[in-house]
Structures are given as structure tokens and as C-alpha cells.
A protein has these predicted regions:
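Outer-membrane beta-barrel proteins
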Residues: 2-175
Length: 175
């Protein structure tokens, strides 16, 4: 919980000084390959600087078995028409701790009063002895509840070595 609080404060201070967004989300994660179910807490933040979209994500998952796992990712991308391809780096603080690369793409569209975002990302390269392969498809609908505050509804599905389904809610703040 302390890590989540620190990550939230860092993200809020970054977002407040640079403009952009911060969201705090909680997902119920179900393993599809006999693994352990978990609850994942996310702090996400982002901004745009000189046409480059910068983002970050801290994910802390508590499994039913009592384990606590955390990862942190930073990404950079640039809009190409309706899509935003991105690259990034991540660090998994799991059992052995390792670094990995990311590539992905997102697209956002106003739908009704809110905004729908869909995307996919995959790990590339890793300092892990036996690299864990993971591709994640994700979707979020941000429904405005105040001028700069939204309610987020999230869904994702992981493929390859990590096979999970996740559904959750969160709150987003724009600056």
C-alpha cells in the first residue's frame, strides 16, 4: 500500500506540473492457465511534450496466495493519424527482478459523453534468464463525472506465457 501511495503522489505531482492525466484503477484479475487470481492496483500518468506522448504505469498485484508483485513501465509515442504507436521500458520487481522492452499501439475515440481507448502491447527483449512472453489487449471507457474527473471502466486480456482476464474500475484526473 505504501508503494501505491508513493507512486500516486509522484504521478500527481508530475501530472500537476506538466499537464496531462493521472488515473488510479483497481482490476480483478483471473488467471486462465491455472495460475493464481489477483487484485491489481494501477497508477497511470501521462502528458504530451513537443508532440511526443509520454506515459507511465505502476502496477501492484496482490495474489490470493498472499504474494505481492510490482512492475513499472515508461512509454513514449507519437500520434500517426488515429493511432498512437509507442515504445517503452519496464522493470518487473517480481521474484528475480528484470528489465524488458515494450512496443504497442493505442487508439482513442469519443463515444457518447466519454472517451473509449483500445490498445495492445507486447514485451520485447528482457534481462530475465528465460524471458516471459506477454501480449496484452486492453480497453478503457472514461465517463466524465466532473469537468476534469472521469470514471474508468477497464478490461484486458493477456496472452502467451501469462494468460489473464481483468476487469475493473478507476478514476481519472486531467490537468
Amino acid at each position: 500500500m505504501k508503494k501505491l501511495l508513493v507512486a500516486t503522489l509522484v504521478a500527481l505531482s508530475f501530472g500537476a506540473s506538466a499537464g496531462g492525466y493521472v488515473s488510479v484503477d483497481v482490476d480483478n484479475v483471473s488467471a486462465r492457465n491455472g495460475g493464481t487470481d489477483s487484485v491489481a492496483q494501477y497508477v497511470r500518468f501521462g502528458t504530451e511534450v513537443a508532440g511526443v506522448q509520454l506515459g507511465g504505469q505502476s502496477r501492484t498485484a496482490r495474489s490470493n496466495g498472499g504474494g505481492l508483485f510490482n512492475s513499472f513501465e515508461l512509454t513514449a509515442g507519437s500520434a500517426l493519424g488515429p493511432v498512437n504507436p509507442f515504445v517503452g521500458i519496464g522493470h518487473d520487481n517480481g521474484n528475480n527482478g528484470y528489465n524488458y522492452g515494450l512496443v504497442g499501439v493505442t487508439a482513442a475515440q469519443k463515444v457518447g459523453p466519454g472517451v473509449a481507448l483500445v490498445g495492445v502491447k507486447t514485451r520485447v527483449g528482457s534481462t530475465e534468464t528465460t524471458p516471459t512472453k506477454q501480449t496484452v489487449g486492453f480497453a478503457t471507457y472514461a465517463y466524465p463525472i466532473l469537468k476534469n474527473v472521469s470514471l474508468n471502466v477497464n478490461a484486458s486480456r493477456s496472452y502467451q506465457d501469462i494468460k489473464e482476464n481483468a476487469f475493473g474500475l478507476g478514476v481519472g484526473f486531467s490537468f
